[in-house]
Swiss-Prot record:
Identification of the protein by name: Uncharacterized protein AF_0569
Organism classification: Archaea, Methanobacteriati, Methanobacteriota, Archaeoglobi, Archaeoglobales
CDD domains, A to Z: RHH_NikR_HicB-like (cd22231)
Example of a GO biological process term: regulation of DNA-templated transcription
Length: 60
């Protein structure tokens, strides 16, 4: 398993309740797992922008 980093976030009660519903329905085993999946989807959405930024950093 690759190294991990622990973070802390604040969510509205509404968002947290929706995440709990996903866990209770069996879609995820924990709220943390649901948040990790959300981050993964976000990073995939911005993959091209992130690659461009990484390339710009190479030229600095």
């Amino acid at each position: 398993m690759p190294p991990t980093r622990k973070i802390s976030i604040r969510l509205t009660e509404k968002y947290y309740t929706k995440l709990e519903l996903l866990v209770e329905s069996g879609e995820f085993t924990s709220v943390s797992e649901a948040v990790r999946e959300a981050v993964k989807l976000l990073l995939e959405k911005y993959k091209e922008q992130l690659e461009s930024i990484a390339q710009m950093d190479t030229y600095r």
